[in-house]
A protein has these predicted regions:
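Exposed, low-structure sequence patches enriched in small/polar residues
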Residues: 1-266
């Protein structure tokens, strides 16, 4: 952290990603790979203004700010470090903002985007975050399957509005429970270059996509509502898939999901 509100980070990784029967690693010629190798370095920056930070001996916790928080990241794949590791560049950015809108509560907004330069096997693409559990994840799509969509250029929106009981607080019996309502909307749009689109019949990509995985050039959108502050701890969300509601051949999807979350609120 160079100064208050501006921090940088630097990292490196070496990994092998193994295939399985659900997520096979198959070349266009039909041969099967055992694993995908990746070696990369990563640099990033986080910029905030007037943010409260709780500092611990070896870590710190960001407590929030009324201003937008900007994050930037750059990853470079290093070829020939491992057998099969490839050269690529990945640029990502995001903005997180929590505007107060009294007396209507507050919003929690995150916008993310990125671009991958180079030809990479699909495990190194942006694999958009599905949620295969019953637990709510604010940065994942509740009705999306794992490995359903991949992109090398993308932008995503995660939006919540917390009404702080402005509606439920008007109902006499529920008012005593202090339940609070939440509106949720999430969406993502992305594209794939021909050299990375493993869903094409005559693909130029290093690997074929698993069954059902495609680009998300038609935006994926899901919306829903939730109730939070149940026993001051629990949150229940009801989410509907708005687009991509028809399954592809051999694919199962869910158009409705119920998620449970745990968050202490005061």
């Amino acid at each position: 952290e160079w100064r208050h509100g501006i921090s940088n980070f630097l990292g490196a990784r070496i990994q092998k990603i193994y295939g399985n029967r659900y997520v096979p690693l198959v070349r266009p010629d039909g041969t099967v790979m055992n694993s995908v190798s990746d070696a990369a370095v990563h640099v990033g920056m986080r910029i905030s203004k007037n943010e409260s930070i709780y500092r611990m001996p070896f870590d710190k916790q960001y407590m929030g700010t009324k201003y937008p928080v900007l994050t930037l990241g750059f990853t470079a794949g290093i070829p020939r470090v491992l057998s099969g590791s490839c050269e690529y560049y990945r640029l990502e950015g995001g903005i997180h903002y929590k505007p107060e809108l009294p007396p209507l509560g507050y919003s929690d907004i995150t916008v993310q985007g990125g671009k991958i330069f180079g030809k990479v096997p699909y495990p190194l693409l942006k694999l958009h975050e599905g949620n295969g559990t019953y637990f709510y994840d604010p940065m994942a799509f509740s009705c999306m399957n794992f490995y359903e969509f991949a992109s090398d250029t993308w932008v995503a929106l995660f939006f919540e509005h917390h009404f702080n009981g402005i509606l439920l607080g008007r109902i006499p019996l529920i008012k005593k429970l202090k339940w609070r309502e939440v509106l949720v909307c999430k969406g993502v749009w992305g594209t794939l270059s021909k050299e990375n689109d493993g869903s094409l019949a005559a693909t130029q990509a290093p690997l074929l996509f698993p069954p059902g995985m495609t680009s998300v050039s038609d935006p994926y959108v899901e919306v829903g509502f939730g109730v939070e502050n149940i026993f001051r701890l629990l949150r229940v969300d009801f989410i509907w898939r708005v687009t991509h509601r028809d399954p592809k051949p051999g694919q199962e999807i869910q158009n409705f999901a119920v998620n449970l979350g745990i968050k202490l609120k005061f």
